């Protein structure tokens, strides 16, 4: 909702600026063209929000809680050991049926960019989604967790094995390397938020075995907002801080960076009062903001898993406690 209001505000401001320049005879043709282009971009364009985090911070679960609670079960793979292995976009294009499109990892052998691959739909594997069948939906979307085993020379060719780099992926017992089966996934489905032009990017955990940070990080600059997830019980770990500093901090527009402290339920404790628990959560929030160098209003606290359970069971009190009732 905020997003559509925000878009209308930008539209109104651009309109006012055009008018102001026109009245004062300051509207050069190239300026007018640029402003009109911005207007069109604002009206038609998608807003890309990327979820980024260290492995197992709950990115996919948060997406489940926000987008899939109505299906009465977990849809995106988010259980231990089954996790998003390739960047996965959630969007809605009214011209296409509900489907999952997958780009095979082997396309990395060619020099074409992801943008170019988007233009060759026949190179993608397309799976129809039955939005009325949550089991079929979950089984189909489980494909984003698929991996394949390849030889070391193949892994080298695909960019998953670099000689002389210390933290290479561990070969399996048979000397093979496990890599993501897919390079990129796109889910097209109808949802009120997606209908407004929101596009969600779920990314592989950044220290998942074989997950190439560049698979994820090349997409970050295109995002209008990035939500960085942390676990509340650990706060900002050394590896969280490395990811933040390396990929997310110091962007020319820090206003696009948000932090979600997930798993606040790990601090819920039968022996503490709810005031004590909220106090603990608040301290973690303030401390996380300080360590990451962001203002406190950029850090929100949630429990994706409890929020998902609360929505499925229609438990208003649990939903309030999960902070996902907003």
Language model feature labels by segment:
Residues 23-30, 35-37:
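Solvent-exposed loop/turn elements at secondary-structure boundaries
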Residues 17-18, 29-31, 195-196:
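A short alpha-helix capping/helix-coil boundary motif
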Residues 1-26:
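Charged, amphipathic alpha-helical linker segments immediately N-terminal to NTP-binding catalytic cores
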Residues 11-12, 36-326:
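Globular "head" domains of long coiled-coil molecular machines
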